[in-house]
């Protein structure tokens, strides 16, 4: 099958198509993980994006459902140097996702690194793609909006409330689902936490009706500035019970506290990002997947930075300056402590979430 990748600057990259015969548009990004292609493809945060893998060989250890981070592939397309194994090919076909192989992913990555993320089109076809078609494809890419103009979270958030581990709880959490990864739910459940997953646009009153011990705002795709409805809910919850966040959830908490976010040139996507705990000086290697970040020049009043990225000094964690009342606790991290895929250095943060919930639950009893 023929494959073509068209970039907004008119660059044409031809290769071998695999997966579904399809045409998709999206923001072209790169991921530096050496393994974890199943988790990456099924991560809802990749909605609206075409993923280029920097590691040259993909598909060499198959596909298992237990590795899924959602109910299927959420990325728009897949770009690899070499694809091996029929399972990855069939996996993409099952979810109608095109892929292209036999291309210079190093060239693509360096282009993104120098110019920033790029609007692009990926097409696969059993018929040769002609020069005349190229002109039309370039036009489609140029007319495609920037990802910050697309409201992606409603496409990946749950439509109804889902409860996990209801019978065996030490504490309970309402998880505001902006596109949550299953690994996050699993990390909470493994620690004896009941998780009530609710839609991204749930209101404060509905969330409190579940009598949770803390709230976790999840990861997800797109620009946090598009999610003012969720920001308002988070703002209204702060001071009522402990509030935590991961990735997009961290950005929403930043805005709710009065801070600002901005779009990174090419983002952080991979399992090898070093993060420093400002207070302790400890460094963790973390898994990350984000294209927006907290502006360190506008730290919200009454808040402080927790963690910084050692590669580019961007903000990786923020918290509300602690008060004696646990209900005022607010903290969030930009990286993914659950990994999925990646290192587990920061999974202790889920222990801290659960301990926070247990403590608040005990105080509520009085």
Curated annotation (Swiss-Prot):
User: Taking every annotated instance into account, which residue ranges of this chain make up the domain Glutamine amidotransferase type-1?
Assistant: 172-363
Tell me which residues this entry annotates as catalytic.
Answer: 247 (nucleophile), 336, 338
Q: Which pathway does it operate in?
A: Amino-acid biosynthesis; L-arginine biosynthesis; carbamoyl phosphate from bicarbonate: step 1/1; Pyrimidine metabolism; UMP biosynthesis via de novo pathway; (S)-dihydroorotate from bicarbonate: step 1/3
Q: Name one GO biological process term.
A: 'de novo' UMP biosynthetic process
Q: Mind telling me which PROSITE patterns this protein's record contains?
A: GATASE_TYPE_1
Q: Where is this region: CPSase?
A: 1-172
Q: Recorded E.C. number(s)?
A: 6.3.5.5
Q: Does the keyword Coiled coil apply?
A: no
A single MF term (Gene Ontology): glutaminase activity
Source domain of life: Archaea
Q: Catalyzes what?
A: hydrogencarbonate + L-glutamine + 2 ATP + H2O = carbamoyl phosphate + L-glutamate + 2 ADP + phosphate + 2 H(+)
Matching entries from CDD domains are given as:
GATase1_CPSase
Q: Which residues bind L-glutamine?
A: 45, 220, 222, 248, 251, 289, 291-292
Q: Does the keyword Ligase apply?
A: yes
UniProt KW keywords: Amino-acid biosynthesis, Arginine biosynthesis, ATP-binding, Glutamine amidotransferase, Ligase, Nucleotide-binding, Pyrimidine biosynthesis
Family per similarity comment: Belongs to the CarA family.
Q: Describe, as the record does, how this protein assembles with itself and its partners.
A: Composed of two chains; the small (or glutamine) chain promotes the hydrolysis of glutamine to ammonia, which is used by the large (or ammonia) chain to synthesize carbamoyl phosphate. Tetramer of heterodimers (alpha,beta)4.
What is this protein for, i.e. what is its function?
Small subunit of the glutamine-dependent carbamoyl phosphate synthetase (CPSase). CPSase catalyzes the formation of carbamoyl phosphate from the ammonia moiety of glutamine, carbonate, and phosphate donated by ATP, constituting the first step of 2 biosynthetic pathways, one leading to arginine and/or urea and the other to pyrimidine nucleotides. The small subunit (glutamine amidotransferase) binds and cleaves glutamine to supply the large subunit with the substrate ammonia.
Q: Which protein is depicted?
A: Carbamoyl phosphate synthase small chain
């Amino acid at each position: 099958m023929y494959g073509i990748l068209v970039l907004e600057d008119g660059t044409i990259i031809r290769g071998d198509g695999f997966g579904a015969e399809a045409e998709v548009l999206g923001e072209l990004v790169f991921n530096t993980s050496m393994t974890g292609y199943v988790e990456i493809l099924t991560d809802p945060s990749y909605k609206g994006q075409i993923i280029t893998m920097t590691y040259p060989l993909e598909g060499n250890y198959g596909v298992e459902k237990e590795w899924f981070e959602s109910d299927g592939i959420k990325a728009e397309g897949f770009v690899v140097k070499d694809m091996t194994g029929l399972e990855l090919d069939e996996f993409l076909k099952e979810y109608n996702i095109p892929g292209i192989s036999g291309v210079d992913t190093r060239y693509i990555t360096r282009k993104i690194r120098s110019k920033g993320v790029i609007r692009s089109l990926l097409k696969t076809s059993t018929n040769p793609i002609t020069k005349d078609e190229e002109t039309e494809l370039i036009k489609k890419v140029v007319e495609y909006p920037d990802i910050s103009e697309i409201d992606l979270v409603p496409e990946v958030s749950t439509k109804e409330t889902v409860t996990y581990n209801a019978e065996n709880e030490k504490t309970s959490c309402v998880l505001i689902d902006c596109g949550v990864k299953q690994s996050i739910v699993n990390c909470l459940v493994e620690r004896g936490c009941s998780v009530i997953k609710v839609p991204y646009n749930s209101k404060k009153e509905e969330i409190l009706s579940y009598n949770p011990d803390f709230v976790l705002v999840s990861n997800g795709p797109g620009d946090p500035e598009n999610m003012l409805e969720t920001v308002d809910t988070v703002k209204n919850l702060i001071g009522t019970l402990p509030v935590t966040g991961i990735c997009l959830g961290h950005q929403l908490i930043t805005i709710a506290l009065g801070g600002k976010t901005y779009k990174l040139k090419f983002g952080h996507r991979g399992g090898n990002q070093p993060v420093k705990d400002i207070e302790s000086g400890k460094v963790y290697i973390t898994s990350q997947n984000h294209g927006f970040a907290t502006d360190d020049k506008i730290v919200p009043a009454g808040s402080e930075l927790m963690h910084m990225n050692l590669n580019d000094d961007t903000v990786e964690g923020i918290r509300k300056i602690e008060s004696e009342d646990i209900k005022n606790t607010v903290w969030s991290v930009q990286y993914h402590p659950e990994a999925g895929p990646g290192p587990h250095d920061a999974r202790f943060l889920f222990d801290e979430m659960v301990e926070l919930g247990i403590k608040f639950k005990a105080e509520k009893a009085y």
